[in-house]
From Swiss-Prot:
Sites of O-(pantetheine 4'-phosphoryl)serine modification: 37
Protein's job: Carrier of the growing fatty acid chain in fatty acid biosynthesis.
PTM summary: 4'-phosphopantetheine is transferred from CoA to a specific serine of apo-ACP by AcpS. This modification is essential for activity because fatty acids are bound in thioester linkage to the sulfhydryl of the prosthetic group.
Gene this chain is encoded by: acpP
Alphabetical UniProt keywords: Cytoplasm, Fatty acid biosynthesis, Fatty acid metabolism, Lipid biosynthesis, Lipid metabolism, Phosphopantetheine, Phosphoprotein
Single GO biological process annotation from the record: lipid A biosynthetic process
SMART domains (alphabetical): PKS_PP (SM00823)
InterPro entries: ACP, ACP-like_sf, PKS_PP-bd, PP-bd_ACP, Ppantetheine_attach_site
Chief location category: cytoplasm
Protein name, as recorded: Acyl carrier protein
Compartment annotation: Cytoplasm
NCBIfam families assigned to the protein according to its UniProt record, in alphabetical order: acyl_carrier (TIGR00517), PRK00982.1-2 (NF002148), PRK00982.1-3 (NF002149), PRK00982.1-4 (NF002150), PRK00982.1-5 (NF002151)
Domain Carrier: 2-77
């Protein structure tokens, strides 16, 4: 797993309180990891802070899974 993926996973585990094993590439933040809409906003803000990037609202709406987050961040850094 890449450094970016490791850092994203750490943020997801910390913010959602889920086991690392549940955070897979296709794991949906809402459907699989129990996040609500506020959690997803907080995740996006945490990703922005961790990686020093800005995620526009329209892009944030497309980040539904762990894999989506990693791909977006890899393209933004």
């Amino acid at each position: 797993m890449s450094d970016i993926a490791d850092r994203v996973k750490k943020i997801v585990v910390e913010h959602l309180g889920v086991d690392e094993e549940k955070v897979t590439e296709t794991a949906s933040f809402i459907d699989d990891l129990g996040a609500d809409s506020l959690d997803t906003v907080e995740l996006v803000m945490a990703f922005e802070e961790e990686f020093g990037i800005e995620i526009p609202d329209d892009a944030a709406e497309t980040i539904q899974t762990f894999g989506d987050a990693v791909k977006f961040i890899q393209g933004a850094v």
